[in-house]
Amino acid sequence: MRFFARMKRISLIALIAVLVSCSTNADRPAPPAAVTPDADAVRAAVQHTFDGLATHDSTMLAAVILPDANFQRWGADSTGTWRTVNLRGGAFTSRLGQPGPAYLERTWEADVRVDGDVAVFSAPYDFWVEQTCSHCGYDAITLVRSGAVESDFRGWRIASLTYTVDASGEDACRERFAGMPASPFPAE
């Protein structure tokens, strides 16, 4: 009996210690996104991807996207059921590097974490097609340093990109993401 009473007491003390440490950490603001040459290069690699999308330039896209990168799109279908679509980096590059409508992808409030030769870029985004907000969501991009370090993005290349898609329209996107920038296109 004494053994169980002692174990209860130890468990209670451990639980209190965990709760105190959690509540103490909850009061602290999250650390700011890193501002280092590598973090800036990661941001440059992501922006390079968006610039390649905007110009439908498969060479630009291939410079920053690994051929075997995994792209995963999460969004609701017409019935409201969440579905995923998977695509390899080479297929993404060749598909979106073809002539087509004008694209613009923007992110804001990006968080960049770098650990050696691996980095994570995460941020809300909006995606515009022909001056209309097509959808918005959240980008989670993993990059690895595997290219030429002399490049504008210091060798950082995209290894995976997982993103959510909310195609409910611009108003719904603005409601969902309070920090969404104003439309990049003049009102008609």
PLM features: residue spans?
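A short local loop/turn or secondary-structure capping micro-motif enriched for an aromatic residue
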Residues: 80-81, 129-131, 165-170
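Short, low-complexity N-terminal intrinsically disordered segments enriched in polar/charged residues
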Residues: 22-67, 176-181, 185-188
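Surface-exposed, charged secondary-structure patches
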Residues: 70, 83-134, 183-187
